[in-house]
Amino acid sequence: MGSQVWVVSTLLISIVLIVLTIVKLKFHPFLALLLASFFVGAMMGMGPLEMVNAIESGIGGTLGFLAAVIGLGTILGKMMEVSGAAERIGLTLQRCRWLSADVIMVLVGLICGITLFVEVGVVLLIPLAFSIAKKTNTSLLKLAIPLCTALMAVHCVVPPHPAALFVANKLGADIGTVIVYGLLVGLIASLVGGPLFLRALGNRLPYKPVPAEFANLEVREASTLPSLGATLFTVLLPIGLMLVKTVAELNMEKGGTLYTVLEFIGNPITAMFIAVFVAYYMLGIRRQMGMGVLLTHTENGFGSIANILLIIGAGGAFNAILKSSGLADSLAVILSNLYMHPILLAWLVALILHAAVGSATVAMMGATAIVAPMLPLYPGVSPEIIAIAIGSGAIGCTIVTDSLFWLVKQYCGASLSETFKYYTTATFIASLLALAATFLLSFII
């Protein structure tokens, strides 16, 4: 009993340490996670060199796979940004008369969010919400909240987004399967947490015009944007290649030439690599961008990923320390005695960590470290489902600790209480619906 108390206390104190150092002391999450790693190692009796070796292997093992995918994904997202491909998707959906404006914003967020970091997606796509709001005299809240909820949902549950890819990789989940489940769950969660929730409010949702300081932000002219076909082909190509790999694994015998080829092109690194050169041509060279210009855009894109790479690397170190110290195995036994369903536990841990730390990425990595050790005790629950459950939890509770909360507040010209009342509630409802959809999927498949 005493050893169990020690294990639980060590884990809880390490989580509190992460939260306090990030929120109160303003540490970068990279430093906070490394500090927590050393703390756990020391508390569990690991030697100094043993701790350092575990941290090195954790960072190297995590980034060895993810660094290339994140780097390639950044290039793809940058090409979407500079070419106007994301705006093309939005303008095309606007022409669908049978789609309401709020549903259009959800679909724009889901499709464009596949290749864009969530904050970048908000900054890039919010002019579309401004444009629609001005044309239709609609409250900006009714458009911006569905957009941001959809972007957050994709960020949390759909690889190749870094956090979703990290979770799938650590749990040993099939990435193609996680993509399919994630898109389905993300769509349901975004539609209910965004449009349906806001429509249910009716006249209680205040009218918010486009703030004066953003009045000059406009969507580019349609004639300057790439075609819809080129845009969708570029966005969906890496997803399609990864899904082909999954289909091959389910339906073909291993070892054949075709199987090997499909495994190769469907590997996330290869799929993203192919997609980058397709994007260079379809969204760049074909539109009179020279290789010098593309190089500049690539370098500019790489400047933004050091932050996420370091955080994910430190998350890998924290996971490695939990395993090497023996805390993970002890924790698995303790959690199995709680009689809480692993899907609910995964969701709840990610939800609480996101609210506490303010980073969905850090929350998902922390939840993975806590939940992963107990998976062997539940062979009936697939790692793909647990990956979606963790992402579903991270969608919710976007509060003042999260930079996205402040982005929404600023762009919508909303007060603090209004942002809490409408946006935070929307993300929590989306998270609950994602949890329900995940449970439903676990019963069906």
Predicted stretch roles:
Residues 186, 342-445:
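C-terminal transmembrane helix pair
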Residues 8-13, 31-34, 67, 102-107, ...:
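Hydrophobic alpha-helical transmembrane segments
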Residues 2-5, 180-296:
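Long, contiguous bundles of hydrophobic transmembrane helices that form the permeation core
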Residues 99-114, 137-156, 174-187, 342-354, ...:
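Alpha-helical transmembrane segments of multi-pass membrane proteins
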Residues 2-11, 62-71, 117-121, 184-187, ...:
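Structural signature of hydrophobic alpha-helical transmembrane segments
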